[in-house]
Amino acid sequence: MKYGRTFNFSAGPAMMPEPVLEEIRDEMMNYRGSGMCVMEMSHRSPVFQQIIDEAEQDLRDLMGIPDNYKVLFIQGGATLQFSMIPMNLMKNGKAVYIETGAWSKKAIAEAKKVGEVVVAASSKDKNYTYVPDCSDLDIPEDTDYVYICENETIHGVTWNELPNTKGHTLVSDQSSMFLSKPCNVSDYGMIYAGVQKNVGPAGMIVAIIREDLIRDDLKDLPIYLQYSTHAGAGSMYNTPNCWAIYCCGKVFKYLKSIGGLEEMHKRNLDKAKVFYDFLDSSKMFKGTVEPEFRSLMNIPFVTESAELDKEVVAATKAAGYDNLKGHKSVGGLRASIYNAMPKEGVEALVEFLKNFEANYGK
């Protein structure tokens, strides 16, 4: 690759588009005549105000975000949202969660510290290799919201059809699929995503939240943990993650320039097909997720043994394919092929794995 870069299959932080990195490099020492790097400038300056305003508008354009939704840039990562969501949205003290993998499981554990959690469906019975049928969930009338993790980064499971919430607010963690395909924002009360997987550098989440869900009656909740604080201050109640906002803004513009989320989705379908076709034809490697629920972003796979898995990880790393080791909680291997991963990277990895299989033991 250019600049001696590697194909980085990390689940996050992950690759960013090369044209974006080049533009960031060119602006590093003197951002548009300001005489300083974005990392150095005041968040209260007119220059940075323009950066954050453009980032929000470009995201609104990309996703078609309605005017009655706020876009918030909040520090703390998706893990903080596991707590902030129930703290802010549990008006009646009850929420329904769907358990489809490690990240929804963690969100459930945190929400239970705040109020009552009803796990209406789970795929734990088959080690989170599918999404349960959620067309007719048992949802209590006084439920405040229904929560899903729309793409499970660790287990490689994705939702193809949203749950029937029976009129209740839907909240979705889209961290590892954010901006990978078109999304009808009006189907959700809230969408959030840690940006380090499919957009920019670590240290921030983007929250898209319907205005009627932003409460101003949470006086006993620490001020930073209230969505109303961030919404009222334009995501700048305190010093935000200026660098992440700037980098994400560049990615939003890049996605617009290539044809938006429709084009990105086509590319992602194409890349994933290359890898899944290989897995389905291989005798050494096999996918772990039921085909109907396979993620376009995170592809877990295994060999016949943990020892061979380790051999493959070592061999791929030596050949310039980084971060293919599966998550420590599940083992195996995992290829994360987010938006910024070029098709050539997937094709090159597949070719390497084919050769590894053909020559193994010879």
Where are the language model's segments positioned?
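PLP-dependent aminotransferase-like
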Residues: T79-V146
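Active-site phosphate-binding strand-loop segment of PLP-dependent enzymes
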Residues: G12, A111, S123-F178
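Conserved N-terminal alpha-helix of the aminotransferase class I/II PLP-enzyme fold
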Residues: S34-Q81, N88, A102, E110
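A glycine-/small-polar-enriched, mobile loop at the entrance of the PLP active site in fold-type I
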Residues: R5-E56
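Active-site C-terminal subdomain of aminotransferase-like
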Residues: M190, V195-Y276, E290, N359-K362
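PLP-dependent enzyme catalytic core of the Aspartate aminotransferase-like
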Residues: M1, T6, A318, G331-K362
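Conserved PLP-binding catalytic core of the aspartate aminotransferase-like
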Residues: F285-T316
